[in-house]
Regions:
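Cell-envelope and extracellular/periplasmic
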Residues: 1-450
Length: 450
């Protein structure tokens, strides 16, 4: 069973950097669980030949899971595959095509991207940067400019120290790098995915979206994120290739209600949710509840991999529990919100809210707003076993409810399997993320996913 693991840094995050590394690495022995990491390469045209990665030394492609190798393996992929191995008893191989800091358009072919109007500004920006970089001497010119900037900084630092002033910030390499790397639209597809054409993959996991939640990078995401699914299915010759979409978590700090309610991360999560809902043979794995330190790289990767494995075992492999019932992998999925006086009753998609509960019986992560569209923290309680009633004394006539809606979401709602509810909102009001000159308007979510 071969699974492709793609995305950015949270998929690239290795076992050695996780919270469980001190327990896991020393006892990792499984000759039937193997992985290969594709070399990080962005190209202007599809690579047709497969370059054997040198990550393991001795020219090896597949690396066997053992203490000396497991530290290099994608952590999410490892814990996912580990659960599949235990349940299915078959060999599992992971092909890691992740690269930290990448955008969704990095993993889609250029011909497909050229058909997406919202990506045109990114192409224009990239082509302009590349032309300027080449005109300025390419790699040699960049090295000379960086050395000059570094020398000027050293002089300024010495002068500041002599004057007792704060030292200036050291220049970074970013402005001097070849644009034909992570900023290259379609570059990752051409350099890392195209060589895999014809691979017989059982499915894929895709963990990406954080870099589309900065500035205006969210603007093409409603087009480029579902394009990844379509592109990968075409690449592997499987129109119904199962793809587990891993929803981004949260990071940084909450600042104000307006900041939280409009944050880019909400846009990304909503696009991920809507892509799942309208795309058959996909699953969406929640992660916002697994971040304990507000880092953009949460250290707990085992539960992410195991939740993804729940989806795969249930939907791809049709596995059942001890009671012969289908495995449950989804948390409560929003369905409807009905206003009754000063309260909003929220219902969920059938079969997702059995055993509905609030963690430690404490309501957290609920917000309501009236016609003024100003949100307030709300109270909530479980009613009728599978619904939740939400209210706020400061909002006499609520018209909208949101849950786990923030750059760093809170949320205590879960089902009886303790699978967290997906972030949701009942309104379709435009969002205006900070540091953005544009607004996001939700498209019709549609149906068709599972």
């Amino acid at each position: 069973e071969v699974w492709v693991c793609g995305g950015q840094s949270n998929m690239a995050w290795t076992v050695r950097s996780t919270r469980d590394a001190d327990l896991e690495v020393a006892c990792a022995h499984d000759p039937l669980l193997r992985f290969v990491r594709m070399p990080l390469e962005a190209r202007g045209a599809p690579r047709r030949d497969y370059v054997r990665p040198e990550h393991g030394g001795a020219g090896k492609s597949w690396r066997v899971i053992e203490p000396r190798s497991v530290g290099d393996c994608t952590a999410v992929g490892y814990y996912f595959a580990q659960r599949l191995r235990r349940r299915l008893g078959v060999p599992v191989g992971l092909v890691d095509v992740s690269w930290g800091g990448t955008l969704a358009q990095f993993w889609v072919s250029k011909p497909r991207l050229r058909q997406i109007a919202s990506v045109a500004p990114m192409f224009a920006q990239f082509e302009g940067q590349l032309a300027n970089w080449l005109e300025a001497g390419g790699e040699q010119g960049a090295q000379q400019r960086y050395e000059a900037a570094l020398a000027a900084w050293q002089q300024a630092r010495a002068a500041a120290a002599e004057a007792g002033d704060k030292a200036p910030k050291q220049p970074g390499l970013g402005p001097y790098q070849d644009p034909r790397t992570k900023r290259h639209p379609g570059g990752g597809y051409d350099g890392m995915l195209a060589p895999l054409r014809g691979l017989t993959a059982r499915g894929a996991l895709y963990f990406q979206g954080e870099n589309n939640s900065f500035g205006d990078m969210y603007l093409p995401f409603p087009d480029t994120y579902p394009a990844v699914v379509a592109e990968w299915r075409e690449l592997f010759g499987q129109p119904a290739l199962p793809i587990g979409l891993i929803q981004i978590g949260g990071w940084s700090t909450r600042r104000s209600m307006t900041y939280d309610m409009n944050h880019h991360a909400n846009v990304v999560r909503e696009v991920q949710f809507d892509t799942w809902q309208r795309t058959p043979n996909t699953g969406l794995i929640v992660t916002f509840d697994l971040n304990s330190n507000s880092s953009i790289h949460p250290g707990h990767k085992r539960p992410v991999g195991e939740r993804a494995a729940r989806w795969a075992l249930a939907e791809v492999y049709q596995q059942r529990g001890r009671d012969q019932r289908p495995l449950r992998w989804r948390g409560p999925v929003f369905s409807t919100a009905d206003v009754d006086g000063g309260q909003v009753k929220v219902r969920f998609q059938e079969g997702t809210a059995d055993g509905l509960r609030l963690d430690k019986n404490q309501a957290s992560g609920f917000y309501v707003a009236g016609e003024d569209q100003v949100f307030h923290v709300a109270e909530a309680r479980v009613v009728e076993k599978t619904a939740v009633e939400v209210w706020c004394d400061a909002v006499a006539a609520p018209v909208a409810v949101r849950y786990a809606w923030s750059n760093l979401p809170l949320g205590s709602l879960m089902n009886g399997r303790e699978l967290p509810a997906y972030p949701f909102r009942s309104d379709d009001w435009p969002l205006r993320p900070h540091r953005s000159d544009s607004s996001y308007v939700r498209r019709a979510a549609g149906k068709g996913g599972r």
